[in-house]
Amino acid sequence: MESKSFSKPTRTATVIVGTQFGDEGKGKLVDYLSDKYDIVVRYQGGANAGHTICFDNKSVVLHLIPSGIFHEGCVCVIGNGVVIDPVALLEEIKKVEELGYDVKGRLFISHNAHLIMPYHKRLDSLHEDAQGEQKIGTTGRGIGPSYEDKFARKGIRVVDLLSPDVLQEKLRENLAAKNKLFRNIYEKEEFDVEELVRDYSEFDKIIDPYVTNTQLYLSRQLKAGKTVLLEGAQGCLLDVDHGTYPYVTSSNPTSGGACTGSGIAPNYVGKVIGVVKAYMTRVGNGAFPSELFDETGESLCRIGHEFGATTGRKRRCGWIDLVALRYSLTVNGVTEIALTKLDVLDTFEEVKVCTSYMLDGKEIHDFPTDHPTLSRVTPVYKTLKGWMSSNAHARTLDDMCPEARSYVTFLEDELQVPVTFVSVGPGREETVYR
């Protein structure tokens, strides 16, 4: 019998993942790479994440729409793994259009993405308040409760906005249960079912032009040879399965989540770029072994403008942690590293790197995956010489001053993954790309 020849996957999809606690600078990398890709996909999270993009003397924060929207010709997709606040989405579309960029025909939203409703936001705040000292540090945007409904099989999806009868039935069913909680447990005012039905029934005509089966769309585009860039929100150490549980987000920012959150098959993924901030930050509660509580930590916060793009909250700051990074690179299968915010370290006489932990008097090199153990470790540091000068002019590694270049190559050697991108300033052009 004659053997048949079948086409093989093109492996033209690239995944960008945060390797730390989020806020690594993924937005700049996506913005920088977007003109090299046909499609950019957001695959998980919601409006709890903020990607800051700096270009043309403007600084723009996006929470839902992929950063590629600012590159003409680039198509943007919000995947099935994202939870969407319809009000926030429409506000963001309006903001992008006011900046002079077309959105219709360039933005597609998965019909299977779940919605964040007003009662999710209230539940988020009430749940957090009830935790007392054990608060997670949620943004209060309703992300967790929306994912709870999704996995309880009670969620309302984007496609339901297009069917008024279905939407009304699901809203009534959900509010019957939620209002009991508000009334009997939290002693709060109930939501008006009729008002919510009326308000959300108006979204069908507005959102309809953007809604499609993005799983099929992406599969067909990949088979046609198109290139796809997948961007996650938050970071590996906040992943609900692989992060510092329970101080985590409610989804999977890891590279595996890129496939489930977009519908793209794994064999289309050619490379995984891990975004690494040159130091570390964390928002909210949870263990942070290399956190600094002194003037150095304050300096990192001040120079790095480390305040949440979504909440405005001050971020906790510390030195880069190679133990955590090795774990993240392994979990995500990272093939190359994008090093960001190197410029924040420009004024430090010395820079420290956490190379291992001490636990109960013993040195360990593996990242503890249970939070009680992680909270007991202390960092072991290696001190490197600072460079005390700007590298904003650099466009190649050779353009950088020797000490900054040594810092990059030290990380590369320790992590055994090539550093192919170095951000030496906030601007799109302030980039070393190897």
Swiss-Prot record:
Its cofactor is Mg(2+). IMP binds at D23, E24, G25, K26, N48, A49, G50, H51, T139, R153, Q234, T249, R313. Pfam families: Adenylsucc_synt. It is an enzyme of class 6 (ligase). Substrate binds at A309, T310, T311, G312, R313, K314, R315. Its EC number is 6.3.4.4. Keywords: Cytoplasm, GTP-binding, Ligase, Magnesium, Metal-binding, Nucleotide-binding, Purine biosynthesis. Binds 1 Mg(2+) ion per subunit. It is found in: Cytoplasm. GTP binds at residues 22-28, 50-52, 315, 341-343, 423-425. It catalyses: IMP + L-aspartate + GTP = N(6)-(1,2-dicarboxyethyl)-AMP + GDP + phosphate + 2 H(+). GO terms for molecular function: adenylosuccinate synthase activity; GTP binding; magnesium ion binding. The active site is at D23 (proton acceptor), H51 (proton donor). Plays an important role in the de novo pathway of purine nucleotide biosynthesis. Catalyzes the first committed step in the biosynthesis of AMP from IMP. Belongs to the adenylosuccinate synthetase family. This is Adenylosuccinate synthetase. It comes from Chlorobium limicola (strain DSM 245 / NBRC 103803 / 6330). The gene is purA.
